Amino acid sequence: MTDKTEKVAVDPETVFKRPRECDSPSYQKRQRMALLARKQGAGDSLIAGSAMSKEKKLMTGHAIPPSQLDSQIDDFTGFSKDGMMQKPGSNAPVGGNVTSNFSGDDLECRGIASSPKSQQEINADIKCQVVKEIRCLGRKYEKIFEMLEGVQGPTAVRKRFFESIIKEAARCMRRDFVKHLKKKLKRMI
């Protein structure tokens, strides 16, 4: 028996790694390394390595540096970080600080208008909520139909939306709900 134990201790070929052990560092360690690299300003240096640069690209979104992302957001909103209004497509300030003369009641009334969403964003929100409701067992369909009334856009967009919801309901085995949706789709067309 001692020969066998000595052979295992000496011969590395017989020693196997556990399946969960790997050569790459853990997720937390990679996060700490990425944070350190960002603080030092050496994000894509040779020391950081290719794995770090790939992670950084994934974290910031499609390899867009955070500084460019901030400027794109500023272009979208029309305001810079210091409160100066800007022309879309340029970074030149137009006027002074933007102030508001609305009272609290006016802000409540204009809450929806202050942050307008596009039709696609509204429809995407509705779709997420409807899919969540479909996946829950024992739900009543009235709430889902109320949400579906809020779908915006031309009939072609609404038709595609209903078809995707029908597919999701069929995937979740909601036959009654699929029948109701098909009836609503026929009425809409």
UniProtKB/Swiss-Prot annotation:
Subcellular location field: Nucleus
GO CC, one annotated term: nucleus
InterPro entries xrefs: INT_SG_DDX_CT_C (IPR029307), Integrator_subunit6 (IPR051113)
GO molecular function, one term: identical protein binding
Keywords from the UniProt entry: Nucleus
Principal cellular location given in the protein's record: nucleus
Keyword Transmembrane included in the entry's annotation: no
Source organism superkingdom: Eukaryota
Pfam families: INT_SG_DDX_CT_C
Similarity field: Belongs to the CT45 family.
Protein's name according to its UniProt entry: Cancer/testis antigen family 45 member A10
Natural source organism: Homo sapiens
Gene: CT45A10
